[in-house]
Structure formats: structure tokens, C-alpha cells
Curated annotation (Swiss-Prot):
GO terms for molecular function: small ribosomal subunit rRNA binding; structural constituent of ribosome. The lineage of its organism: Bacteria, Pseudomonadati, Pseudomonadota, Alphaproteobacteria, Rhodospirillales. This is Small ribosomal subunit protein bS6. The gene is rpsF. It comes from the Bacteria. GO terms for biological process: translation.
């Protein structure tokens, strides 16, 4: 038997107990067909990157299991039939990691680091008065505003009196 990791995404409008019921249903299918569930994690309600079937949030569930291919196929068939499951993905792995997955580990580290900042903590804006005077490389005509070194008379060459 091979080792697999399955992630399923369930609709946002079902309760946490219903998500647990879904998880028990799918792990039961694996056990009935000769598989063994190694690890189950509820990652909770998370915001989706894009809408899936009109849902902006979804419940994520991780299942690490060892099962024959027929058991995995039967579980995936039941997931595709179930209307509460938005998406699922099963991947064959070499080993199932002990302890928490990265999704749960990062959640704890993030809160220990403190606030990550944003646009509100940048401080006052500089006034851009530190640039100095405009430079003249000699490859352009005179400037119209009076602060350039070649601005004389306020008009460009070739601009005469127009009638």
C-alpha cells in the first residue's frame, strides 16, 4: 500500500461538526477498503484566493493515509459526488510527516512575531525637496518655467508672434 495526502475544501456555510462528519465519512471509506488513516487535521475556515462555486471562504481538511489505490479511488468518487466538497486533491508521498503540518505551524509562528506592519507604520512622507536644482545636459531647448538655467524670455526658439 502507498502513502497519500488528501486535502479537501468544504463549503463555508456548513458547521465545524458537519466538516468533522464529512471527514469521518471519507476516513471510514478508506478503512472499509483496507486503508489506514495516519493523521487528520482540521485547518479551519480560510479565505479562498478566488471564488469557487460562489464561496469566498472554505473549510480545509488534511488527511494523511496509507491505502490501496482502489480505496483512494472510492474515496475520491464519493468526494466528487458530495455537494459540500468544493475541491479535493490526493497526492502520493514518500512519507507522512510527524507532528503538525506547515499550515498549522505557521499559524502559531505568525502570532509570536507580533504585528507585521503595513501602510500605517511608514512614518511621515518626505517632501522631495532633497533633489536639488534641475540639471541641464544641453540636449534640449530652453525650459518654459523660470527655474531652469537656459530659460530666457519664457518662450522656446521658433515660437514667434502668431497672427
Amino acid at each position: 500500500m502507498a502513502l497519500y495526502e488528501t486535502i479537501l475544501i468544504a463549503r463555508q456555510d456548513i458547521t465545524a461538526s458537519q466538516v468533522e462528519g464529512l471527514t469521518e465519512t471519507f476516513t471510514g471509506i478508506l478503512k472499509e477498503n483496507g486503508g489506514e488513516v495516519k493523521k487528520v487535521e482540521q485547518w479551519g475556515l480560510k479565505t479562498l484566493t478566488y471564488r469557487i462555486k460562489k464561496n469566498r471562504k472554505a473549510h480545509y481538511v488534511y488527511i494523511g493515509h496509507e491505502a490501496p489505490a482502489a480505496a483512494v479511488a472510492e474515496m475520491e468518487r464519493n468526494m466528487s459526488i458530495n455537494e459540500d466538497v468544493l475541491r479535493f486533491m490526493t497526492v502520493k508521498v514518500e512519507k507522512i510527516e510527524e507532528g503538525q503540518t506547515a499550515m498549522l505551524t505557521n499559524k502559531g509562528e505568525r502570532s509570536e512575531r507580533g504585528p507585521r506592519g503595513g501602510f500605517g507604520d511608514r512614518g511621515p512622507r518626505r517632501d522631495f525637496g532633497d533633489r536639488g536644482p534641475r540639471r541641464d545636459f544641453g540636449d534640449r531647448g530652453p525650459r518654459r518655467d523660470g527655474d531652469g538655467p537656459r530659460a530666457e524670455g519664457g518662450r522656446n526658439e521658433g515660437e514667434g508672434d502668431r497672427a
